[in-house]
């Protein structure tokens, strides 16, 4: 669909796509937005530069030494940053593009490699009228049940997927489930099986064989 942005393979590998990131940091407005996001999420990154000869991105970190009030700086290969930081930078491009154009972002496992508080912050950006004046939408799948929060989502914004005995998957909105009020603890109800959609785990039936393999 028009103005729909999907998570691509490069982000699934947590690697910012070279050409897209280079274009982003060469655009003053986009780079400012990216650095503001990295600052707000406590990454410690104050700048991102691209070495055209080596074709390597470097992140800049500033710090104060113990015996000096002056700040020192160091540069780190972007691939040496945490997986969460790399993924945040990789996702920022489609986030910014959708916020500017008012499109829809579709991401599988939004929370992968991200701290839960960071994931919540990204969601709140899309909920903010100030940051999202063009009504961009974020659609994502997650395994983080803490995001099932009435302060983040209405009942009609949360969906459960469930496999039946034949392996087919169905999807249902919490608003369609009888007895689900807007003031209930959604995460607690989900984890105790009230909504369905939880895996059937046969923990007592699993027995690990500690014998050494036969050579």
Say what each PLM segment does:
Residues 203-205:
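Long, compositionally biased
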Residues 58-189, 193-198:
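Switch/communication elements of ASCE P-loop NTPase nucleotide-binding domains
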Residues 1-92, 100, 195-197, 207-210, ...:
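Phosphate-coordinating catalytic segments in nucleotide- and nucleic-acid-processing enzymes
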């Amino acid at each position: 669909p028009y103005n729909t942005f999907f998570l691509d393979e490069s982000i699934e590998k947590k690697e910012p796509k070279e050409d897209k990131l280079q274009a982003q940091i060469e655009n003053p407005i986009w780079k400012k937005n990216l650095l503001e996001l990295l600052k707000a999420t406590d990454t410690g990154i104050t700048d991102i530069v691209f070495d055209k000869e080596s074709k390597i991105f470097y992140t800049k970190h500033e710090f104060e030494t113990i015996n000096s009030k002056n700040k020192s700086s160091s540069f780190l290969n972007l691939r040496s940053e945490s997986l969460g930081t790399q993924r945040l930078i990789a996702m920022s491009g489609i986030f910014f593009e959708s916020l500017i154009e008012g499109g829809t972002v579709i991401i599988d496992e939004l929370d992968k490699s991200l701290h839960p508080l960071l994931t919540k912050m990204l969601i709140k950006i899309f909920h903010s009228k100030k940051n999202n004046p063009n009504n961009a939408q974020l659609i994502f799948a997650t395994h983080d049940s803490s995001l099932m929060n009435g302060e983040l989502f209405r009942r009609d914004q949360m969906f459960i997927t469930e496999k039946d005995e034949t392996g087919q998957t169905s999807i249902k909105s919490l608003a369609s489930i009888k007895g689900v009020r807007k003031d209930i603890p959604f995460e607690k109800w989900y984890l105790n099986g009230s909504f369905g959609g939880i895996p059937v785990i046969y923990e007592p039936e699993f027995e690990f064989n500690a014998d050494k393999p036969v050579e």
